[in-house]
């Protein structure tokens, strides 16, 4: 099959999807914003061709590249796995006659207000929400549902541009910070109290072929705002437990409601005093290299299963569930440049056999801000057969390692 893949080399994790497609015999062609010469040699060796355009979200330019490819060969699929690219790819697919995720599905997985309306219509519990473009409308919503409220871009990804307001005064400050006070259209939602996690799937022809559940410790907004916290994301191997059955059942309902056919999915959820509620839905894989955790935990190549699903509408391996797998982010103690680490010898001495991935930027490397994400600075990924033991190990690493900056 001939597959067009958007941004085949950046961010670095994109290369795994290209690798998997090439490994099952697909002819892979790239469309991206970087010059071909900037691609790494391994990715170049796996591409049959490449078109550079100014922006992969600029639909006329993307459509030009796709039609150029179609002039030379039959294009079976146009694939992307990055949130910001999903809607543009869907629009261009429909204009060029290429099968795949529809524009409706892509839009429902991108526009937070429409997404939650579709979930409520399907009977999926979710936060009360609305789209607003004036402070007065936001204040009216807050009076209706009560504080706290969450304000975010309608097309937000992760915690980017997300604010919490606990009072009218804070809501007015948020309105100025996010542009609402100047007429920007944003999504506003009730704050859902509870533990936060996510449900990820590989869905084939509308049926969930394999699935995973991960937990945030602590919840994302707190993790992305608090330097001293070493936040964790942990994938469970206890999918047989009743609570996960409830998540899976709602996940199937979401898949049907949004019209997801063959795609990776990412579904955020909260569990608290009001029960289980689904939040953001993405028609793409999770971020923070989480598929690498699923591969390590399940003793299989999830990227290959995705490639088989895209190219042949099937998968041939399931995760073993032998391990739980988690990542812990280790933040610098201040902004600046890395000077040194303390505690590394201790954790490698204790847990070397559990570690399946890590990154410790060399001294002199500039630090990244806390809000840049879980893998922006130092991190460690580990697996263990027992979920609770893994949590204890991750906690110990967070208490032992210090990333010093100056």
Where are these regions (language model features)?
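ATP-binding N-terminal substructure of ATP-dependent carboxylate-amine bond-forming enzymes
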Residues: 1-105, 136, 332, 361-366, ...
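Short beta-strand-to-turn element immediately C-terminal to the catalytic PLP-Schiff-base lysine
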Residues: 132, 162-167, 202-204, 272
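A structural supersecondary motif
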Residues: 265, 347-365
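A glycine-rich beta-turn/hairpin centered on an aromatic-Pro dipeptide
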Residues: 308-352
């Amino acid at each position: 099959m001939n597959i067009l893949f958007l941004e085949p080399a950046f961010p670095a994790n994109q290369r795994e999807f290209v690798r998997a497609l090439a490994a099952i015999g697909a002819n892979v062609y790239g469309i991206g914003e970087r010059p071909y010469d900037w691609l790494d040699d391994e990715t170049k060796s796996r591409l049959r061709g490449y078109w550079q355009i100014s922006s992969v979200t600029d639909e006329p330019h993307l459509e030009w590249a796709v039609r150029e490819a179609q002039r030379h060969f039959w294009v079976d699929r146009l694939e992307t796995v990055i949130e910001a690219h999903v809607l543009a790819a869907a629009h261009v697919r429909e204009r060029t006659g290429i099968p795949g995720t529809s524009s409706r599905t892509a839009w429902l997985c991108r526009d937070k207000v429409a997404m939650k309306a579709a979930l409520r219509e399907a009977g999926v519990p979710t936060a009360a929400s609305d789209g607003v473009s004036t402070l007065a409308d936001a204040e009216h919503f807050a009076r209706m549902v009560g504080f706290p409220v969450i304000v975010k871009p309608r097309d937000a990804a992760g915690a980017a541009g997300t604010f919490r307001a606990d009072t009218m005064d804070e809501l007015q400050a948020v309105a100025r910070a996010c542009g609402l006070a100047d007429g920007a259209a944003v999504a506003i939602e009730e704050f859902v109290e509870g533990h936060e996690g996510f449900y990820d799937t590989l869905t084939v022809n509308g049926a969930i072929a394999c699935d995973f559940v991960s937990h945030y410790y602590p919840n994302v907004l707190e993790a992305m705002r608090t330097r001293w916290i070493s936040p964790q994301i942990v994938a469970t191997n206890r999918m047989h437990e009743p609570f996960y059955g409830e998540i899976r059942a709602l996940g199937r309902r979401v898949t049907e409601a949004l019209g997801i056919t063959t795609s990776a999915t990412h579904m955020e959820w909260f569990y608290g005093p009001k029960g289980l509620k689904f939040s953001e839905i993405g028609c793409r894989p999770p971020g923070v290299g989480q598929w690498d955790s699923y591969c390590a935990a399940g003793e299989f190549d999830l990227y290959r299963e995705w490639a088989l699903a895209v190219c042949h509408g099937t998968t041939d391996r399931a995760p073993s569930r032998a391990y739980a797998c988690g990542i812990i982010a280790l933040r610098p103690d201040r902004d600046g440049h890395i000077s040194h680490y303390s505690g590394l010898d201790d954790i490698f001495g204790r847990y070397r056999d559990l570690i399946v991935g890590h990154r410790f930027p060399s001294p002199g490397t500039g630090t990244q801000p806390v809000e840049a994400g879980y893998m922006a600075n130092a991190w460690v990924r580990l697996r263990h057969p027992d979920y609770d033991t893994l949590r204890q190990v991750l906690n110990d690493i967070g208490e032992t390692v210090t990333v010093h900056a100056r």
